[in-house]
Amino acid sequence: MSSIADRKTTGITFNIQKYSVHDGPGIRTVVFLKGCPLKCRWCSNPESQRKSVELAYNTGRCLTLAKCVRCVEICTAGAISRAEDDTISIDRALCNDCEQLCSGACPSNALITYGAHKTVDEVLRAVEQDSLFYARSGGGMTISGGEPFAQPAFTLALLREARRRRVHTAVETCGYASWDDMAAALPFLNYVLYDIKNLDDARHKEATGVSNQRIVENLRALRAEFPGIPVLVRTPVIPGFNDNEADIAAIAALTRELGVSYQLLPYHRLGTQKYHFLDREAPMGEVTLDAETMRRLEAVVAQTADS
């Protein structure tokens, strides 16, 4: 496809995060895309799960309808009404992927729009603002989500155009995608961050909603067909799911077999508030991960690597 066509390709992003140092080499800009085929109970970005633009509501910022009624008046779908405490109630069945006039009209930013339609050119203009940092640190752009391959055409166009502009590229993927979509994008990638959550298929399906077979198959295919691309496999350590020696040792053994790097990520609760903003329950509740468990599991990874 031509550069002109790629630059005009449109996708739905929900954040462009500057100066990230944890999502690939160097200083990076992370482009977060909407949509994910998994429904992980521990997901810290609930706003990433659905492909559509979504409206969130932070009641703590609301001026209440006693002082401001802009959102009620401007909503063309009739989705916003008065709640008993003079805040607002959002009918999610009526709220649709509109122009989000209500969040634009909200003077206190209590209404938040998660998601924006952007072209490849718009995204890369934001990414290229930090080109000096990339040059000095070996950084670049990382496409994350959600799941980048849930928007395969946009992801491919974004990677192709980034390559034309000599921007170092990386992708964060759960691996649950069409291999054809992944294989089309991989020639334009410099680095891959790949999630493996559990090798027990039944437990993986129970916790994420999908089988892990395609995920493991795609990782093996990636290593076989694109051996020159550095891969970092990452596992979020989740209390009650994979915070044990057997699960982590099994994944560590797979990464050793495939010759890829491996990293554990500690569970955190930073996304809990966003569930409430979207009128959803946070599935993990008040669960926490203790530091001693992480130290023990990191020792397991080190031992497996040395064996």
Swiss-Prot record:
InterPro entries: 4Fe4S_Fe-S-bd, Aldolase_TIM, BssD/PflA/YjjW, Organic_radical-activating, Organic_radical_activase, Radical_activat_CS, rSAM
Catalytic activity: glycyl-[protein] + reduced [flavodoxin] + S-adenosyl-L-methionine = glycin-2-yl radical-[protein] + semiquinone [flavodoxin] + 5'-deoxyadenosine + L-methionine + H(+)
Domain of life according to the entry: Bacteria
Residues engaged in binding [4Fe-4S] cluster 3: 75, 95, 98, 102
Needed cofactors: [4Fe-4S] cluster
Domain Radical SAM core: 22-307
Keywords tagged on the record: 4Fe-4S, Iron, Iron-sulfur, Metal-binding, Oxidoreductase, Repeat, S-adenosyl-L-methionine
Residues binding S-adenosyl-L-methionine: 42-44, 146, 195-197, 268
EC annotation from Swiss-Prot or TrEMBL: 1.97.1.-
Biological or metabolic pathway of the protein: Organosulfur degradation; alkanesulfonate degradation
Transmembrane regions listed in the UniProt entry: none
Database matches in PANTHER family: PYRUVATE FORMATE-LYASE 2-ACTIVATING ENZYME, PYRUVATE FORMATE-LYASE-ACTIVATING ENZYME
Self-association state and partner proteins as the record states: Monomer.
Function description: Involved in an anaerobic respiration pathway that converts the sulfonate isethionate (2-hydroxyethanesulfonate) to ammonia, acetate and sulfide. Catalyzes activation of the isethionate sulfite-lyase IseG under anaerobic conditions by generation of an organic free radical on a glycine residue, via a homolytic cleavage of S-adenosyl-L-methionine (SAM).
Name of this protein: Isethionate sulfite-lyase activating enzyme
Annotated organism of origin: Nitratidesulfovibrio vulgaris (strain ATCC 29579 / DSM 644 / CCUG 34227 / NCIMB 8303 / VKM B-1760 / Hildenborough) (Desulfovibrio vulgaris)
